[in-house]
Amino acid sequence: MLCKKHFLYFCALLKLYMLNMNFYLSQIPERIPKPRKSGLTMIMDKGLSIGEVHNFMSIGAPHVDIVKLGFGTSYVTPNLKEKIEVYQSYNMPIYFGGTLFEAFVIRNQFKDYIKLCQNYGITYMEVSDGSIEIPHKEKCDYITELTKYGTVLSEVGSKDATHIIPPYKWIELMQAELNAGSTYVIAEAREAGNVGIYRGTGEVREGLVQEILTKIPEEKIIWEAPQKAQQLYFLQLIGCNVNLGNIAPNEILALESMRIGLRGDSFFFYLDKK
């Protein structure tokens, strides 16, 4: 019969196995295991080859929750179907970037967009209006319609740095889109992290973020955070299970290490904490 000490050690080893860790360290924060609904990492694929996707998934799959095929890259990607099938072979949810959705909408090809997703077996879809103006009721109607075909993510915020949205409006838009059927709302930042919830310098608009969190559940927001300092801010504010997006593929292990206090920037976050 196992003593309590041995039982706890066995449980720790089992947890390591489930979370794809290689050895035991005490005082490591608990990451929600996959498949998870919060603590998500969304990767932005801006043009990986099929071989690079294989290599990336071989190390990244345990730590990645969703992959976005960035902006309109899907239109010009060679062997797109085969590339998508590689991701799908790892049971990895993928979706076309919101800019591609907008490209279909502005050309009055919304039904073609639905067919595109169906043809490629895509069951995650992003609705955004960062490049074009869509009346918000119409945007919410798109969200509701797409829920018939899969999981919808909707992006709030403009790609135009001169278009400043006040905090109350961010909250209003996010609430309406969640009510329309979005599973998550994405806080816009672009791949550079210099618009939307950030200033042009990349600095977080802290007042905006904290006001949003007074009304919108943290587990329903994916914060685009391509820069390390931005990721660190949200880890400090919300914790290791914050949803982060627009992460570069080659940063996945670095981010996961920082989430759990194994990078210099977050080294002391969880020591002496259970």
Predicted feature residues:
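Hydrophobic faces of well-ordered beta-strands that scaffold small-molecule active sites
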Residues: 38-44, 65-69, 94-98, 125-127, ...
